[in-house]
Amino acid sequence: MLKKLYNSKSSKQRNMIPVFKPLIQSSEINAASKSLKEGWLGMGKYVKDFEKQIEKLCKIEKSKSVVAVSTGHAALHLSLKLLKIKKGDEVITPSFNNTADFQAIKACGANPVFVDIEEKTFCIDVNKIENSITKKTKCIIAMDYGSSLCNHKYLKEISCKYDIPIIHDAAHSFASQYEKSFIGNQHQFTIFSFDPVKSITCIDGGAIILNKKEYENKAQAMRLIGMNQSAQLMYTNNRAWTYDVLDIGYRYHLSNIHAAIGLEQLKKIELIKKTRQDSFLQYNLGLKNISWLSTPEENIKNKCPFIYTIRVLNGRRNELRTYLSNLAIDTGIHWQPGHKFKYFKNERKHNLQITEKISEQILTLPFHTYMEAEDIDYIIKCIKEFR
């Protein structure tokens, strides 16, 4: 039984039930302390161990490589740079996506091309991609959402047909499976995020799964501001004092302390997955007969759900948010679509009818490993009493 973070008293006495809460326990604190006491604060042996454990847990194919980096955004940016995405290029991605994806594209001088999503899954609508492809299209970024996975089979067909690489943004789907294969094995590039709110956290961190050995060597240098330092040497808590710089680089490496925390998190993946699956099913059961609300699809076998998002169908989403906040229940909105931000409003886009509708209805409820059945019962009760 996990220690409760909030009590079960009246709403006036309750602590706010947060949308997110990372599972940080004594093991993570001890691992961080041990790493600090060892004195090697940069990239070192724990980073190597973290990469190997991801490889093992996700059953990454032998032809692929894992490169740990500082954030999920860093993983996206490096993936695009490895593909030589440049000014004037276009990258197809759903407008209903995280801002990190759009900013990574812009950081390369390229432009996002916004396409619509599927109403059922909130993932990229694969049937809308081909009409957006031009001679400038150099990449497609597809992101899994919440507990839903993209149609990766059809994405691979599009990739092969047009010779356009896929970057799979799997920030939401770490440790999940698609057609019996773990996420990380579907496309040329897969990126993970281990930020403070993800199912698995390094406090901040990320990783790229690469399908070519040459990409691995380049990514290892690029994450170290372009220095061709031997990764294998640094993985022994050491470094070379002579090296060369052969390409552009960034300060995107993962530190030992973050990797040490991540290693402890990976040991708890089955606990994290099970508690999230249980919470997901409890929410769906309790909310299924409310006429003005729709719940996410229930196909969560072999998945590790990241967020729990409902749709408020009566136009009163913001009223419901205020009502729940007054009852000590925090909520979120994932996300505001990219084409509505000032910085991206002039980017090329096609019919975004589903994106427009969904973005006005979505509401993310509290969903994390510390939650217990009584917390979810309380949230369900409050939603049912909303008038």
Regions found by a protein language model. Name each.
Residues M1-L41, D244-L246, P366:
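N-terminal "arm"/small-domain region of PLP-dependent enzymes with the aminotransferase-like
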Residues S10, V47-Q53, I60-K64, N127, ...:
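PLP-dependent aminotransferase class I/II
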Residues M43-E90, A104-C108, F114-D116, S181:
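Phosphate-binding glycine-rich loop
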Residues V67, I92, V113, I166-I167, ...:
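Structural detector of well-ordered beta-strand residues that form the stable sheet scaffold
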Residues K81-K161, P165-A170, Q177:
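PLP-dependent aminotransferase-like
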Residues I117, P196, F367:
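Short, conserved catalytic or interaction motifs in soluble domains
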Residues H168-C202, N217, W241-L246:
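Conserved active-site segment immediately N-terminal to the catalytic lysine
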Residues F192-S193, G206-K212, L263:
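Short beta-strand-to-turn element immediately C-terminal to the catalytic PLP-Schiff-base lysine
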